[in-house]
Amino acid sequence: MGRAKKVVLAYSGGVDTSVCIPYLKQEWGVEEVITFAADLGQGDELEPIRQKALDAGASQSLVGDLIQPFIEDFAFPAIRANALYEGRYPLSTALARPLIAKRLVEVAREVGADAVAHGCTGKGNDQVRFDVAIASLAPDLKVLTPAREWGMSREETIAYGERFGMPSPVSKKSPYSIDLNLLGRSIEAGPLEDPMVAPPEEVFAMTRSITDAPDAFEEIEIRFESGNPVAINGQSLDPVAMIREANRLAGTHGIGRLDMIENRVVGIKSREIYETPGLLLLIQAHQELESLTLAADVLRSKRQLEMQWSDLVYQGLWFGPLKEALDGFMDRTQEHVNGVVRLRLHKGNATVIGRGSSDSSLYVPEMASYGSEDQFDHRAAEGFIYVWGLPIRLWAASKRSSR
């Protein structure tokens, strides 16, 4: 008896998910495999996927357009939370996983499947993200994980697929594993597994090299409303168009490349190369506007909780209760994050050169100025310092008396 009758497989068109189709049928006795691929803005990469799955033995090959919810419901909350895992990675890949899992469960319900499956390996983050998200949304659904159990090496997996007429997508010339969506690209494997090897220019596609970036700088203005980016250089943009334009601007000037050693959920360190031009640009601008519009104690607390929010998303806990509670905090803080940030883009750098808010700024020039318009009561400082420093004076006196 097979492990399931009808399975919906999260499908990317890569080696592992393609091999999963015949493997589920031949080795695990699954009667029918339906694939689901999410359109997250990959572009031309999606074109051959539908037929590729059918050629591998899928009974149906479904592709769902998830670009708009991906940006509105996942990327924009990440911008409001200034989400940077370990202070650097803006979660471009991690943000996609809960959305794919959500739609995978919905498709399984629609077609009457008794299980879902994915092609994640046993040492990556995505297995955690998919399994935990599916368990959160549909604890009754069986999750099949052939790539975690089949025990084949990369070479053996490719050879298995070739038995069923699958061409190898990995060549000696291009040995990299690449994940792509509208927010960015993640590149790993091949020579990049040596952390001392510099990434060759050929692995980048969304950003220009510093040498190829324009010699002249470009100044832009990004406007935010309630923490969401809504316009660039005075032109209002819907969320998807906003990400595309931010990608174009930042990528042109070589902004958005990351090369980092990352701590995976499973406990190992991995070397990751990311291209996330637009997302990094928008987060930088958003952080700057918050410095102008949030009270000091709120800003400090939010910076601490941003790290926790980022960890939860990275660790696959998007649908968990703590993440939901933190969402409420983040949303409340954004009510007055309104204004404009001006940045200068040049040769890999985005430098903030101005920020302003007509209705939400907590910067009061008359209080900050040292000129004739200064309205700060300097005489009040003495009493404030006395009370502020009282615990220190009492502590110092106690030390002296104990000698």
Curated annotation (Swiss-Prot):
Q: Please verify whether the record's keywords include ATP-binding.
A: yes
Q: What class of enzyme is it?
A: ligase
* Sites where the protein binds ATP: A10, Y11, S12, G13, G14, V15, D16, T17, S18, A38, G119
Q: Quote the record's binding site residues for L-aspartate.
A: T121, N125, D126
Record keywords: Amino-acid biosynthesis, Arginine biosynthesis, ATP-binding, Cytoplasm, Ligase, Nucleotide-binding
Asked if the record carries the keyword Cell membrane, the reply is: no
Annotated positions binding L-citrulline: Y89, N125, R129, S177, S186, E262, Y274
What InterPro entries does UniProt report for this protein, alphabetically?
A: Arginosuc_syn_C, Arginosuc_syn_N, Arginosuc_synth, Arginosuc_synth_CS, Arginosuc_synth_type_1_subfam, AS_cat/multimer_dom_body, Rossmann-like_a/b/a_fold
Pfam families given for it? Answer: Arginosuc_syn_C, Arginosuc_synth
Q: Which GO terms describe its biological process?
A: argininosuccinate metabolic process; L-arginine biosynthetic process; urea cycle
The UniProt GO MF terms for this protein read: argininosuccinate synthase activity; ATP binding
Source superkingdom: Bacteria
Catalytic activity line of the entry: L-citrulline + L-aspartate + ATP = 2-(N(omega)-L-arginino)succinate + AMP + diphosphate + H(+)
Q: Where are the transmembrane segments?
A: none
Instruction: Spell out the subcellular localization from the entry.
Output: Cytoplasm
Provide the E.C. number(s) assigned to this enzyme.
Answer: 6.3.4.5
Report the Gene3D superfamilies cross-referenced here.
Argininosuccinate synthetase, chain A, domain 2, HUPs, Single helix bin
Query: Which pathway does the database say it acts in?
Result: Amino-acid biosynthesis; L-arginine biosynthesis; L-arginine from L-ornithine and carbamoyl phosphate: step 2/3
GO CC, alphabetical: cytoplasm
- PANTHER family from the UniProt entry: ARGININOSUCCINATE SYNTHASE
Oligomeric and partner information: Homotetramer.
Which family does the record claim for this protein? Belongs to the argininosuccinate synthase family. Type 1 subfamily.
- The name of this protein is Argininosuccinate synthase
Q: Which organism is it from?
A: Synechococcus sp. (strain CC9902)
